[in-house]
């Protein structure tokens, strides 16, 4: 999740540097807290330091990127980062069993309710509470949707029933991050919301196809069960890394769906001023390279080494060049 957050924060940095301005709708599922006082205080300093330490430990590059933002925007983006990072730590804790992780995530839902009631537990919660208060147009449902997706992901031998369920999961764990960041961009939701969600979902679907082998090692199969069954492929076949022509056909179908989402995101980039369209196009082309790589290897994304599908530095540079050329020729 934090990797997706880094991508979206980079877009935020770009957008604020180029004067990109957006607005979001007022669609919330939780009761908002009483007004907070925003003057600089020792409490605010404690919040900043707590989150900086978290970034320094886990994502030092992101800490550097956050310094490119003005103070208020950096503080809000960092508060969102801390929320996502600490959720990751709950689900990635190797010492916890499924029941414990599920309980901790339920506790985290209640904790978010407390944030909305201005009852933060610690300094990092307080930072998020201030972000919520400063942005009346912030949608609160994505915070809960993300936790729901993470709960489902903790189930042993995780499977997905159909494409609709896969789309919902991709929204929960990736599209939600974009919605959380929209207030930082001041986005016009009618013009940008669907494209932003499409980009997040595409990134997640491509990550699933890219990371199939390491996911199998964790007992997780994210390809739709109905599609596998229609091709005569069982979950056990996938867990045993049997990459049959029928299995690869399902991979190709999901890859086509991811490409359609990339196209939707690509079409939505025209609403962005400045160099915003360029950076969206770069992300689209980078992730499209994974789809090209999958096609080149015959959609065989299972291997005994447990490694994910990779693209090299030259491919990444070429994707960036391709994106730049596309944007410049479209002007």
Locations of the language-model features?
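A composition/secondary-structure signal for short, hydrophobic, low-basic-content segments
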Residues: 26, 33-35, 168
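Intrinsically disordered, low-complexity serine/threonine-rich segments
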Residues: 18-31, 308, 315, 324
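Absolute N-terminal positional cue centered near the fourth residue
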Residues: 1-5, 36-39, 275
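N-terminal mitochondrial targeting presequences
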Residues: 19-22, 33-44
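Catalytic cores of Mg2+-dependent Asp-rich isoprenoid enzymes
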Residues: 43-202, 209, 213-331
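N-terminal chloroplast transit peptides
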Residues: 1-29
């Amino acid at each position: 999740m934090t990797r997706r957050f880094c991508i979206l924060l980079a877009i935020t940095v770009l957008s604020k540097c180029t004067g990109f301005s957006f607005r979001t709708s007022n669609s919330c599922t939780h009761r908002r807290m009483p007004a907070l006082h925003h003057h600089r205080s020792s409490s605010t300093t404690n919040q900043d330091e707590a989150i900086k330490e978290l970034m320094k430990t886990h994502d030092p590059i992101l800490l550097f990127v956050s310094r490119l933002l003005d103070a208020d925007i950096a503080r809000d983006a960092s508060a969102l980062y801390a929320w996502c990072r600490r959720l990751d730590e709950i689900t990635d804790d190797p010492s916890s069993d499924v029941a414990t992780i599920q309980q901790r995530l339920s506790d985290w839902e209640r904790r978010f309710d407390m944030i909305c009631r201005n009852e933060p537990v610690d300094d990092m919660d307080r930072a998020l509470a201030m972000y919520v208060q400063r942005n009346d147009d912030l949608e609160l449902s994505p915070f809960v949707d993300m936790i729901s997706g993470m709960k489902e992901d903790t189930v042993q031998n995780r499977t997905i029933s159909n494409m609709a369920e896969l789309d919902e999961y991709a929204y929960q764990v990736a599209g939600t991050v974009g919605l959380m960041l929209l207030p930082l961009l001041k986005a016009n939701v009618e013009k940008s919301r669907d494209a932003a969600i499409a980009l997040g979902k595409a990134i997640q679907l491509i990550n699933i196809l890219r990371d199939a082998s390491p996911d199998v090692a964790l007992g997780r199969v994210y390809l739709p069960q109905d599609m596998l069954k229609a091709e005569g492929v069982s979950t056990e076949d996938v867990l045993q890394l049997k990459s049959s022509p029928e299995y690869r056909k399902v991979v190709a179908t999901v890859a086509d769906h991811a490409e359609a989402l990339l196209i939707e995101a690509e079409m939505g980039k025209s609403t962005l001023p400045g160099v915003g369209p360029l950076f969206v196009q770069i992300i689209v082309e980078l992730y499209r390279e994974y789809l090209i790589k999958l096609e080149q290897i015959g959609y065989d994304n299972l291997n005994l080494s447990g490694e994910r599908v990779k693209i090299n530095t030259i491919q990444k540079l070429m994707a960036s060049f391709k994106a730049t050329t596309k944007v410049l020729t479209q002007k």
